[in-house]
């Protein structure tokens, strides 16, 4: 079955929730932490989660991670070309 998606990476219990943030959210993130876009950790456009989200280079991904000590925390990554 070439070309047919058979599995979603987000269905796996170890893969945290991902989403592409809006331009307004991106500007607020940069302002809140007083950083430049280039200072964010990077994630490649070929990453399976990024591909499934349909994100493109320049987008920022918000990752919601669960921690036994911190509860839930947000992590941000900049999508870059391979």
From Swiss-Prot:
- Give the top-rank taxon of the lineage listed in the UniProt record for this protein: Archaea
> Does 4Fe-4S appear among the keywords?
no
Localisation = Cytoplasm
UniProt keyword Repressor, yes or no? no
- GO MF annotation: an example: DNA-directed RNA polymerase activity
Q: Which residues form the signal peptide?
A: none
Known InterPro entries for this protein?
Answer: Arch_Rpo5/euc_Rpb5, RNA_pol_subH/Rpb5_C, RNA_pol_subH/Rpb5_CS, RPB5-like_sf
Per its UniProt record, what Pfam families does this chain match? RNA_pol_Rpb5_C
Q: Which GO terms describe its cellular component?
A: cytoplasm; DNA-directed RNA polymerase complex
Main EC class the enzyme belongs to:
transferase
The record's EC number reads 2.7.7.6
Q: Which PANTHER family does this UniProt record tie to the protein?
A: DNA-DIRECTED RNA POLYMERASES I, II, AND III SUBUNIT RPABC1 (PTHR10535:SF0)
The protein here is known as DNA-directed RNA polymerase subunit Rpo5
State the organism named in the record.
Answer: Thermococcus gammatolerans (strain DSM 15229 / JCM 11827 / EJ3)
Underlying gene: rpo5
